[in-house]
């Protein structure tokens, strides 16, 4: 038996004419590819999860690609409380929380948008080892649209108990 087949617990992406933020949850203790759940950014309502037997996939935010700021640095401040799972019982003990602020310069002025406002959400895996950060470009289907992005200034911090 091999554990495999999960989608990332948190993904920022571009697809079907949208920029989106997606949260995925898997409460199964040992998961495989037989139970797949992946919400479609084009068809999904914001904060309405698509679910399967053990998994949930939720679009926390989306905006049309035409409205997304371009040719500038964009800073995302992301605060996450991961969902707490019941290990072998495959239950959800406490839902997670997601908060995202997007900021950038436009016409010489600072723009700051609170795009996901402390939303209760299912996010994470039933895995006591925790999570790690990874980024990359994943092409969907036969897309040949040129993409360029940079990552700089990435930081992780423990949330203070006063938040």
Segments predicted by a language model, with ranges:
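Active-site cradle of extracellular carbohydrate-active enzymes
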Residues: 1-79, 91-127
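Acidic/polar loop patches that form or flank catalytic/metal-binding clefts of enzymes
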Residues: 88
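Ligand-recognition surfaces built from glycine- and aromatic
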Residues: 119-163
């Amino acid at each position: 038996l091999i554990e495999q087949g999960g989608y990332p617990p948190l993904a920022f992406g571009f697809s079907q004419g949208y920029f989106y933020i997606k949260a995925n949850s898997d409460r199964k203790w040992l998961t495989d590819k037989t139970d797949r759940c992946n919400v479609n950014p084009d068809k999904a309502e914001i904060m309405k999860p698509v679910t399967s037997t053990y998994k949930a996939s939720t679009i926390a935010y989306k905006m049309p690609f035409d409205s997304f700021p371009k040719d500038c640095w964009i800073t995302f401040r992301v605060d996450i409380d991961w969902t707490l799972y019941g290990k072998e019982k495959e239950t959800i003990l406490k839902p997670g929380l997601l908060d995202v602020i997007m900021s950038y310069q436009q016409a010489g002025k600072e723009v700051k948008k609170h795009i996901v406002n402390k939303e209760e959400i299912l996010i994470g895996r039933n895995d006591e080892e925790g999570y790690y950060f990874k980024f990359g470009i994943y092409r969907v289907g036969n897309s040949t649209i040129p993409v360029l992005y940079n990552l700089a200034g990435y930081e992780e911090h423990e949330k203070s108990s006063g938040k």
